[in-house]
Amino acid sequence: MGRVRTKTVKKAARVIIEKYYTRLGNDFHTNKRVCEEIAIIPSKKLRNKIAGYVTHLMKRIQRGPVRGISIKLQEEERERRDNYVPEVSALDQEIIEVDPDTKEMLKLLDFGSLSNLQVTQPTVGMNFKTPRGAL
């Protein structure tokens, strides 16, 4: 079984990654040298633990965003995704089919004046079998 990492190791690794992300990689030995240069770490054992966790987090970051670590590149990508505007608006279609409930919601949101709305009756849900022994 693996060892439990202390909050000192985790916090130090997160701070190092946020500040020096561009200098770090997936190699433990280069991360160890970077940690040695940028931080005053009292012991060799602690330095190696921090460098190991930095390497672990760097591998996780490559797969996707990691909770608790804010990197400018990831922030910009998230901002770009949030501000996405489609080429053609969904409201520019010739006929938009909606059910009566959706029509009511659009009316409450002041979209009731859309001329291309066509109210259709909702389709009946799946025909589920009755549970065994219910008859």
From Swiss-Prot:
Chain's role: Component of the small ribosomal subunit. The ribosome is a large ribonucleoprotein complex responsible for the synthesis of proteins in the cell. Part of the small subunit (SSU) processome, first precursor of the small eukaryotic ribosomal subunit. During the assembly of the SSU processome in the nucleolus, many ribosome biogenesis factors, an RNA chaperone and ribosomal proteins associate with the nascent pre-rRNA and work in concert to generate RNA folding, modifications, rearrangements and cleavage as well as targeted degradation of pre-ribosomal RNA by the RNA exosome.
- Provide GO CC annotations from the record: cytosolic ribosome; nucleolus; small-subunit processome
Q: Does the keyword Ribosomal protein apply?
A: yes
UniProt superkingdom: Eukaryota
Q: What is this protein called?
A: Small ribosomal subunit protein eS17
The record's principal subcellular location, in a coarse class, is cytoplasm
Arranged from A to Z, the UniProt key words for this protein are: Cytoplasm, Nucleus, Ribonucleoprotein, Ribosomal protein
- Molecular function GO terms recorded: structural constituent of ribosome
What Pfam families is this protein classified in?
A: Ribosomal_S17e
Sorted alphabetically, the Gene Ontology BP terms of this entry are: ribosomal small subunit biogenesis; translation
Cellular localization per UniProt: Cytoplasm; Nucleus, Nucleolus
Per the record, the similarity remark reads:
Belongs to the eukaryotic ribosomal protein eS17 family.
Q: Does the keyword DNA-binding apply?
A: no
Task: Give the multimer and partner information.
Answer: Component of the small ribosomal subunit. Part of the small subunit (SSU) processome, composed of more than 70 proteins and the RNA chaperone small nucleolar RNA (snoRNA) U3.
Organism source for this protein?
A: Gallus gallus
Which InterPro entries does its entry note?
A: Ribosomal_eS17, Ribosomal_eS17_CS, Ribosomal_eS17_sf
